[in-house]
Regions:
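A short, polar/proline- and glycine-enriched secondary-structure boundary/capping micro-motif
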Residues: 24-30, 86-90, 162-167, 174-176, ...
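C-terminus-biased signal that marks the final domain/tail of proteins
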Residues: 2-5, 12-14, 128-129, 136-137, ...
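A contiguous strand-loop segment
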Residues: 2-94, 127, 318, 324-327
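Short hydrophobic/aromatic-rich beta-strand segments that constitute the beta-sheet cores
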Residues: 76-78, 163, 287-289
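Proteins synthesized as precursors that undergo proteolytic processing into mature forms
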Residues: 93-129, 243, 247-251
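Aromatic- and glycine-enriched pocket-lining scaffold segments that form the walls
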Residues: 113, 117-155
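Short, surface-exposed beta-strand-loop junctions and turns on beta-sheet-rich folds
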Residues: 21-23, 82-84, 158-161, 293-297
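Short acidic-glycine loop/turn motifs at beta-strand connectors
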Residues: 8-11, 70-72, 145-149, 155-160, ...
């Protein structure tokens, strides 16, 4: 399972996610320059497009992005959506895009949510595997840009494609986004502040602990619990003064729902855990990340790469723990 966050603070916009799985696929930071030719299975190729940076794997010289941001600050992340995602057959009047092409197809062409929405009006997410060894994953997507604090959720269900405006700027997994959003109604009394005694004011009920306003905030590893908790954390997060402080704030939001090993068994002796957490400064094109085995924040700068070349640039993850010994 996974968690994604869209966060605007001051003049900076941040977008990122936790990738929660039981195995690593050899993720790396991948920069796709403007002249790398994106070839698609059913639609016209993009031979010149916006440059991208994100996390993914490269197979047969093709970037399979888990999350990415383009040079204009438009960002996307794909999250697990099992049992609900329903990809379609080819349609003659639509842009037939496979899910593994969806991120580059949008980010290669759109500079904003408004432009992405225009592309989505003709989208048909089709069931075409990357290969026999790499079948499609059931996904839904969060999209954010640098122009507003709002974001989009895209889901392809049995009854068709749904594009939701997302007022809270977070996404996890099942159930569908509209149900996740409605579920927040059950937590309208949760607060970062101590609440007045409304149970029975005449009865002495003491604030015996700090944090009682968040007593009913869920803490499970399940996707509905994580949606509520990360929405609460994000919507109450500080708006710090400097970009680096804001990056730190963003990682604290993600880490509020990270998964340690051995707490979420998905198969006998196999446990889901947070493989990496990412945060992109979408205004500056800086991709920050931490990994399960290295809490230090590492960064790759999009604009330090030659963006007019035609070859992918990859960066192996710094996943060995770094300790700053002070004596």
């Amino acid at each position: 399972m996974c968690t994604a966050v869209n966060f605007q603070t001051g003049s900076h916009h941040f977008f990122g996610r936790n990738l929660d799985l039981e195995i690593s696929y050899g993720e790396q930071v991948v920069v796709t320059p403007r002249n790398y030719p994106f070839h698609f299975r059913q639609v016209a190729p993009l031979t010149h497009h916006y440059a991208l940076i994100g996390m993914g794997i490269v197979v047969d010289n093709y970037p399979l992005y888990f999350d990415a941001t383009n040079e204009k600050g438009l960002s996307m992340a794909g999250l697990n959506y099992p049992g609900n995602a329903d990809y379609k057959a080819l349609a003659t009047d639509k842009a037939n895009v496979t899910p593994f092409e969806f991120i580059p197809w949008v980010l290669g062409q759109a500079a904003s949510i408004a432009e992405a929405k225009q592309l989505l009006t003709k989208l048909n997410l089709v069931k075409i595997n990357f290969s026999d060894d790499l079948p499609l994953s059931p996904l839904h997507w969060l999209i954010g840009d640098t122009h507003s604090a709002t974001s989009l959720v895209v889901e392809c269900d049995k009854d068709g494609l749904h594009v939701y405006d997302n007022p809270v700027g977070v996404l996890t997994n099942n159930p569908s986004f509209d149900k996740q959003l409605f579920n927040l109604n059950n937590y309208r009394s949760v607060s970062p502040r101590v609440q007045e005694n409304s149970f029975q004011p005449a009865t002495a009920l003491n604030d015996y602990s700090r944090g009682l306003g968040s007593h009913f905030l869920p803490g499970g590893m399940d996707s509905m619990s994580r949606f509520v908790k990360v929405a609460f954390t994000k919507l109450n997060a500080p708006h710090s003064a400097t970009p680096l402080e804001q990056v730190t704030d963003f990682f604290h939001i993600l880490h509020s729902v990270e998964q340690p090993k051995n707490l979420d068994e998905v198969a006998p002796n196999q446990f889901e855990y947070t493989i990496y957490s990412s945060c992109v400064d979408a205004d500056q094109g800086i991709y920050y990340y931490t990994t399960y085995t290295n809490n230090q924040i590492n960064a790759v700068k999009l604009h330090n790469v030659d963006l007019d070349q035609a070859k992918l640039t990859t960066y192996a993850l710094a996943d060995q723990q770094t300790v700053n010994y002070q004596n």
